[in-house]
Amino acid sequence: MSNVIFFNSYKLKKGVSVPDFLLAVEKLSNEYISQQKGYISFNLLVDGETWADFTTFKTMDDAKRFAESSEPNKLAEKFYSFINLNSCKTHYFSVERSY
């Protein structure tokens, strides 16, 4: 079974502090995402005004369980406070090959 990438792209709200956003991402990654079942890695990307992140999980079930989690989470709430939610796009990818 191949690993799965949970990929998200989005834009930040106008006027937010990028350093504050980066701190929120770091805390979310270190204190919550990395603790999830099947977690392998987390990456944050940027191209101009478009940001993206991808989290690698061991299985599709692990990725979907994480994505569909509805437990209250102050770290996620802080992260989403920086995001223009109308710009969000999400996709799951199965890793076909790694070189």
How would you name each of these model-derived features?
Residues 11-23:
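Short, surface-exposed ligand-recognition loops at beta-strand->loop->(often short) alpha-helix junctions
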Residues 27-28, 34-40, 56-91:
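An amphipathic, aromatic/His-enriched active-site/gating alpha helix that lines ligand/cofactor pockets
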Residues 3-11, 52:
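Active-site-flanking beta-strand signature of metal-NTP-handling nucleotidyl enzymes
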Residues 16, 61-63, 98:
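Residue-level signal for secondary-structure boundary sites
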Residues 92-99:
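Short, low-order "capping/linker" segments at domain edges
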